[in-house]
């Protein structure tokens, strides 16, 4: 996926995780605003965006209700308290220096019963383990689980811990982008009582509600 495709990706597979009743939504790392545009068109939601790259943020501004160009981690962006029904973090938390602090901050921006919906790469993904164990490779790439711009790496349990230690209750934790195991890996998984099931997924989606 080239840079332009990356910022334009609509992420339609994430739509089903966004609560149907969410009327005010904040999309952090909104790219060119495609996911937010889909939410506005299909749900009639009010969608705000935050995008680090100014040129991309300017494109999103033509699609969303309000867009901030800047870094959510630095405190340069001021968001209203208790305003959003849902905050979206599609493949963005792993790029942050301190995602725990950002998630803790976002709790005050949510309305009662508001949720954070995120997708996070799975470092225990089958292809990563295969390269590491069999090929002795840990190779950073331009995209994917080992994107060279990722600062944090999570397993399924790590995703749960990330949210719980940041003051959230995990409502949904589900794998997406499933791969097929080779017969050898299926056999190994069976011998281990299916303890490798989580390695089928390149990402996990977490829906979490802020603790009161």
Predicted feature locations:
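Short N-terminal helix/helix-N-cap motif within the alpha/beta-hydrolase-1
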Residues: 97-101, 128
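Acceptor-substrate binding/catalytic loop of class I
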Residues: 142-158
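Conserved N-terminal segment of class I S-adenosyl-L-methionine
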Residues: 1-82, 86, 100-103, 135, ...
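A short SAM/SAH-binding and catalytic strip from SAM-dependent methyltransferases
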Residues: 88-97
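Conserved class I S-adenosyl-L-methionine
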Residues: 118-139
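A short glycine-rich, Lys/Arg-flanked "PGG" loop and its adjoining helix->strand segment in the class I
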Residues: 101-115
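Hydrophobic/aromatic residues located in beta-strands of well-ordered beta-sheets
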Residues: 47, 116-118
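A SAM-dependent methyltransferase catalytic signature shared across enzymes that methylate proteins
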Residues: 159-174
